[in-house]
Amino acid sequence: MYSLFRPLLFTCDAERAHDISLRTLDIAYHSGALPLLTRHTRPLPTTAFGLNFPNPVGLAAGLDKNGTHIDALFALGFGFIEIGTTTPRPQAGNPKPRLFRLTQQQAVINRMGFNNLGVDALVRNVAGARRRNGPLGINIGKNKDTPNEQASNDYRYCLERVYALADYVTINLSSPNTAGLRALQEEQTLRRLIGELRETQETLAAKHGRHVPMLIKMAPDLSDSDIDAAARVLNEMSVDGVIATNTTVTRPLLRQHPLASEAGGLSGAPLLGQSTLVLRRLRTHLPETIDLIGVGGICCGADAGAKMAAGASLVQCYTGLIFKGPQLVGECVEAIRRRLEASSSGRENTQ
């Protein structure tokens, strides 16, 4: 069905198409037509960060920034949904145009800039969501005008506001579209920031009587030495999990494309190799007690399998949905299922 809808959608500019897609999704969900338009996703129970997931394929942050489409998105078959990024105060983001579709390359360049209605609006929306078919992650960031020296105040404020409603919280330190944000991944800065957030997490756990996992979302553009340094900090601070990765400011395989010079983060198929290398290196340098989510460039089931092979416990997709539609979710689940079955069969044959 999506293959019939996509050509019409792609006649619109990318951001308008994004808005139309979400409105159409809501209409289909509330009218009861959504099951007729999507394939049933078979369960593949998975455990990570101490949470139970109906399947290991989730939606990455960025599609539903304000938590206004949670019910409809879960109905697409995702094992978990991550909403945001949200910030303490509302902000408009960067000037338009700020979202560019590279159709032939199955890629997107965005410089949205954390446009959102603020964490208080998101909290109200989450509280009003009726269906939770799997864990809900909430991705938090800092406001554009908050200096890095005060970034922990923004993150702690958001963490306190969302803690009671989130199944896990992602600390977004890696968007390339907020000036200076990625500097927070520098080893000493990262150690100080995560230390403060871990203290807040422990205080909130005691207050609410439950531990909400805290994940760190990393950039794909780090050098090997920077990845290793970050891994040391993440291990020392005993974070619950890591998401690898965010979008890239490099332009792999796109040098001749007319949009390659547009500022912003690149996602989609060209990011697959780079993000998977970072994932694999993090897996090598982190203990198995720290689960990883693989994201970046997943456009088919084989891509999801590659993330799992590189050490991911879960995967997320977003840009691939733009080009493949909701069927990508089930395709990824089945690819991961086949990989697990083949691995299990191989172990049995060697015993």
Curated annotation (Swiss-Prot):
Its cofactor is FMN. It catalyses: (S)-dihydroorotate + a quinone = orotate + a quinol. The active site is at S175. Gene3D superfamilies: Aldolase class I. Pfam families: DHO_dh (PF01180). One of its GO terms (biological process) is 'de novo' UMP biosynthetic process. Keywords: Cell membrane, Flavoprotein, FMN, Membrane, Oxidoreductase, Pyrimidine biosynthesis. FMN binds at A61, G62, L63, D64, K65, T85, N139, N172, K217, T245, G268, G297, Y318, T319. CDD domains: DHOD_2_like. It is a peripheral membrane protein. One of its GO terms (molecular function) is dihydroorotate dehydrogenase (quinone) activity. Pathway: Pyrimidine metabolism; UMP biosynthesis via de novo pathway; orotate from (S)-dihydroorotate (quinone route): step 1/1. It is found in: Cell membrane. One of its GO terms (cellular component) is cytoplasm. Binds 1 FMN per subunit. Its main location: membrane. Substrate binds at K65, N110, R111, M112, G113, F114, N172, N177, N246, T247. Its EC number is 1.3.5.2. Monomer. Belongs to the dihydroorotate dehydrogenase family. Type 2 subfamily. Catalyzes the conversion of dihydroorotate to orotate with quinone as electron acceptor. This is Dihydroorotate dehydrogenase (quinone). It comes from Xylella fastidiosa (strain Temecula1 / ATCC 700964). The lineage of its organism: Bacteria, Pseudomonadati, Pseudomonadota, Gammaproteobacteria, Lysobacterales.
